[in-house]
UniProtKB/Swiss-Prot annotation:
Subcellular location(s) of the protein: Cytoplasm; Nucleus, Nucleolus
InterPro entries documented for this protein: ExoRNase_PH_dom1 (IPR001247), PNPase/RNase_PH_dom_sf (IPR027408), Ribosomal_Su5_D2-typ_SF (IPR020568), RNase_PH (IPR050080)
Keyword terms, alphabetized: Cytoplasm, Exosome, Nucleus, RNA-binding, rRNA processing
Function: Non-catalytic component of the RNA exosome complex which has 3'->5' exoribonuclease activity and participates in a multitude of cellular RNA processing and degradation events. In the nucleus, the RNA exosome complex is involved in proper maturation of stable RNA species such as rRNA, snRNA and snoRNA, in the elimination of RNA processing by-products and non-coding 'pervasive' transcripts, such as antisense RNA species and cryptic unstable transcripts (CUTs), and of mRNAs with processing defects, thereby limiting or excluding their export to the cytoplasm.
GO cellular component terms attached to this protein's record: cytoplasmic exosome (RNase complex); exosome (RNase complex); nuclear exosome (RNase complex); nucleolus; nucleus
Listed name of the protein: Exosome complex component MTR3
Something else known: Present with 7380 molecules/cell in log phase SD medium.
Oligomer and partners: Component of the RNA exosome complex. Specifically part of the catalytically inactive RNA exosome core complex (Exo-9) may associate with the catalytic subunits RRP6 and DIS3 in cytoplasmic- and nuclear-specific RNA exosome complex forms. Exo-9 is formed by a hexameric base ring of RNase PH domain-containing subunits and a cap ring consisting of CSL4, RRP4 and RRP40.
TM helices/strands, residue ranges: none
Residues covered by region (Disordered): 1-44
Listed GO biological process terms: exonucleolytic trimming to generate mature 3'-end of 5.8S rRNA from tricistronic rRNA transcript (SSU-rRNA, 5.8S rRNA, LSU-rRNA); nuclear mRNA surveillance; nuclear polyadenylation-dependent CUT catabolic process; nuclear polyadenylation-dependent rRNA catabolic process; poly(A)-dependent snoRNA 3'-end processing; RNA catabolic process; RNA processing; rRNA catabolic process
Gene: MTR3
Similarity comment text for this entry: Belongs to the RNase PH family.
Amino acid sequence: MNVQDRRRLLGPAAAKPMAFSNTTTHVPEKKSTDLTPKGNESEQELSLHTGFIENCNGSALVEARSLGHQTSLITAVYGPRSIRGSFTSQGTISIQLKNGLLEKYNTNELKEVSSFLMGIFNSVVNLSRYPKSGIDIFVYLTYDKDLTNNPQDDDSQSKMMSSQISSLIPHCITSITLALADAGIELVDMAGAGEANGTVVSFIKNGEEIVGFWKDDGDDEDLLECLDRCKEQYNRYRDLMISCLMNQET
């Protein structure tokens, strides 16, 4: 016995299935955040990205490439997170700078740079807004390579390594600033820095205030000349950070 399911709505016996023509779906093009500073600055190109790590509060990627060097930094921000124990009237910041797979820099150098960065961002982050809270910042040096293959002796190589780690500091500051902004952490101002022959100067407030000064061992130069060169780089990096954050919002 043929029993028909009366709950189903059946069409006519001669009905045919509908046929659809092949259509192309338009996929909107993603906006590029690759930014190149104007000027000579050793023909250095910068690529800035934010918000690409899901399991943290804020993240940033800074890729820098010049004719002789290439660097890639990833920064992850966790917090503000409550601190158990005694009450603190303002938040605390911890910054850890870690090597990538190459293990290029020793631990003491990285700790020294981390302490320098903490001094800067203790002045930049509005810690009074985060009582009894901690903000943990991790900077990973994922790629750092010298593109020149010139053979060097041990002394020259040691000086080059010292110069390279000082040239990393402005990119660390840029990456941390972008990651903090991505995490929604309140900042007094956007911090940036420039480097000139081993001297690093970090600025805020359009270059009117210095929040950090780093000087490698080496030949002493005219500090005013280094200051002007660092300030010029700071203004360039600051404009790039603002453009990056504006592009992420649109």
